[in-house]
Curated annotation (Swiss-Prot):
GO terms for biological process: antibiotic biosynthetic process. Part of the bacABCDEFG operon responsible for the biosynthesis of bacilysin, an irreversible inactivator of the glutaminase domain of glucosamine synthetase. Catalyzes the formation of alpha-dipeptides from various L-amino acids in the presence of ATP. In vivo catalyzes the ligation of L-alanine and L-anticapsin (epoxycyclohexanonyl-Ala) to produce the final bacilysin antibiotic (L-Ala-L-4S-cyclohexenonyl-Ala dipeptide). It catalyses: L-anticapsin + L-alanine + ATP = bacilysin + ADP + phosphate + H(+). Binds 2 Mg(2+) ions per monomer. Pathway: Antibiotic biosynthesis; bacilysin biosynthesis. Monomer or homodimer. This is Alanine--anticapsin ligase. The keyword Ribonucleoprotein does not apply. Its EC number is 6.3.2.49. Keywords: Antibiotic biosynthesis, ATP-binding, Ligase, Magnesium, Metal-binding, Nucleotide-binding. Signal peptide: none annotated.
Amino acid sequence: MERKTVLVIADLGGCPPHMFYESAAEKYNLVSFIPRPFAITASHAALIEKYSIAVIKDKDYFKSLADFEHPDSIYWAHEDHDKPEEEVVEEIVKVADMFAVDAITTNNELFIAPMAKACKRLGLRGAGVQAAENARDKNKMRAAFNRAGVKSIKNKRVTTLEDFRAALQEIGTPLILKPTYLASSIGVTLIKEMETAEAEFNRVNEYLKSINVPKAVTFEAPFIAEEFLQGEYDDWYETSGYSDYISIEGIMADGEYFPVAIHDKTPQIGFTETAHITPSILDDDAKRKIVEAAKKANEGLGLENCATHTEIKLMKNREAGLIESAPRFAGWNMIPNIKKVFGVDMAQLLLDVLCFGKEADLPKGLLEQEPCYVADCHLYPQHFKENGQLPETVVDFVIESIEIPDGVLKGDTELVSFSAAEAGTSVDLRLFEAFNSIAAFELKGSNSNDVAESIKQIQQQAKLTAKYALSV
């Protein structure tokens, strides 16, 4: 069979490059379009070059030789991408036409809506224009969820301080304030007290002015205020060590939802995720309720052909509360870990759906559990405040070393990999915690409880050597 050609809009996020490009190139010819060259790391650029039959970079972002250099690491691109949505759509269509591509995909949430419009214009399978807009604007997303038959929650659009005051009066506290257009929990804030609510709103509103997003990202209001979803851990888990929410990965094919795998989580730092354990140890009844909620949510958004990453709060009486869903792959190493545990390559599966629809080899339900658990974990400065190695009052520090001591792993849990920020790395604690991962590690074991306990022990006992000054 002749290999089909797929256009990849290359940028940050989703399935990590170290898996995506090799997996995709095994079955498909890849053309990579890079709309934001400054958002591509050196290692990402090398993989793009290695596995693509052609690479197209937006010429407007090259003014000097320095612009051809790629950073070693990047979490969020802070340079301006000032092209309006229609211009981005035109560029995608132009590159797609040039190579007569059979499908278009991206791992970056910020380009989902322009990509959907390009797919429609070209007659290619995609998420769907209205569905992509629903999924990218959290106000529209919540409205779609509330219509879809999942748990309905109070919410209000917020643009101004007056809007926020009105939301406080209607919803009360605790209240969640979310930017409608970002990802990775950036800017998500829990408002607990009426007395400090306005100050919190002003702080977040001011901080978000420093978070650059492409001009093509559009929204009707910059914030959504939502009723807080209260978790009820003991109604779902029989043992400690996990969190009161999960994520479920799935695939939409011709408007139908196909669940793939559920990830358990370890307790968060605020709204910053700390670890994902694949697969979930929840019982069959719990998994069924989660799948039902995810199906209603993603089909309720109107999604047609795409990957889905859906986050669900585990509430009282086993009610599944929809946090949000995105028409893209999960980040971190969640997609590679599905392949490690189950042998299913979701990168290839998505491209199969985009090229062949329901002729793809779609799962008949959640993948069956293998006798293996894999955990994808990060350490943050807050962990070292909690274990006493950083004073609470520190606002910045310089890393000298981070180490995991011997004897902290439980059962047959193995430390598969560990990486830490280089000596000399400066860390600014005034940033949202999500920006400040300072170490990452992967664990593998035959017992999920042992893996979860090993994560906890590492969080409590990892050794940080750092330089800092305390305010007088």
